[in-house]
Amino acid sequence: MIEKVYQVKLKVYGPVHIGSGKIIRKQEYIYDRRKSLAHIVDGPNLVKFLNKKGKFTAYLQYLNTTKERADLYTFLRQEQIDTNDWKTFVLYTERVNQGKIDMKDHNPYSRTSTNRRQVDKGMNDLHLFVRDGRGDLYIPGSSLKGALRTVLEGANQSAEAFHSLSISDSLPIDPKNLAIYQKIDINKELKPMPLYRECVNVGTTVEFTMKINSDDWTIEKIEKQIQQAYLQYWNKWFVGMVTTPGGKAFIKGGGLPSVLHAKHRPTVLFLGGGTGFPSKTTHYLQKPKEQAQKDIFAILQRRFRNVYGKMATVPKNVPMVLKGTVNDSTNKWYQQGVCLLEFQPIGEA
């Protein structure tokens, strides 16, 4: 058996979140709303700094008084702690992208628009991106392999096909390619949700090494299955979602770059958290559209009784929400976790 080796280039077209499982509260980071920046804090160094300045007791009192409303930025400003001193306890800084939505017109607000309602809101808990033992950002090979597994299972490929693949962890990701994005549900309207994630930013290319240990399984077959899975996703679900009022605004905001259009048969793969039920399961890959809708609806009725449980009939689109987000500095919209894959042969082992 000849082992075939490939370089995998994952090009990010929608923010990718691979969660570390760690969530920090707004008392544990500094959110500068005016500049749309979040400064992630080293807790021990913050305590050391506050003790040195004689402010630690005041901070505890502030937390006790304000409770859930407490945020570190407000406390530092109240205590007149200069921003130049923040470097003592700030680990790194990221841009924050919040959804600022015109609910009447179902359009993103332009930051330069004269009729834009001024949105001055804080952040909630922040879901952090995975890092290795050295603190470097990376995407585990298991995350990419898991996404490929869904595609292969959807095409009814044997377990042998999946087990013949081995994928390395990615090369380290430059911290400058990390940003915070807010979850936005897209259907009848564009609905920002109180969920914030650290994500690999759009425009980043992440590299892996993949090996195929099979004489029968080829990179051409894998590419074909990825393309076919995206076509099923597109025809059976996505085209319906983008005809909703929110979906139309999403498209108008640049949510579907030409390179991702199904007519080009792109090797699109959805990766990471928040990409949505259709891309995480095989229902639309294996079943006729009507049957997939019925089966998904039955599952969602059990999981979300307050929404789907109240419905007597299967809605036109199931699930009813497209998972998206927006870069509020450019007003460009994205599907969460949408990526393009490229495979380049390295050699044979």
From Swiss-Prot:
Keywords assigned by UniProt, alphabetized: Antiviral defense, RNA-binding
GO molecular function per UniProt: RNA binding
Further comment found in the protein's record: Encoded in a type III-A CRISPR locus.
Protein's name according to its UniProt entry: CRISPR system Cms protein Csm5
InterPro entries linked: CRISPR-assoc_Csm5 (IPR010173), RAMP_III_fam (IPR005537)
Domain of life according to the entry: Bacteria
Keyword hit for RNA-binding: yes
NCBIfam families the record matches: cas_TM1807_csm5
Record-stated family: Belongs to the CRISPR-associated Csm5 family.
Recorded name of the encoding gene: csm5
Function: CRISPR (clustered regularly interspaced short palindromic repeat) is an adaptive immune system that provides protection against mobile genetic elements (viruses, transposable elements and conjugative plasmids). CRISPR clusters contain spacers, sequences complementary to antecedent mobile elements, and target invading nucleic acids. CRISPR clusters are transcribed and processed into CRISPR RNA (crRNA). This subunit might be involved in maturation of a crRNA intermediate to its mature form.
Subunit details: Part of the Csm effector complex that includes Cas10, Csm2, Csm3, Csm4 and Csm5.
Entry keyword RNA-binding: yes
GO annotation terms (biological process): defense response to virus
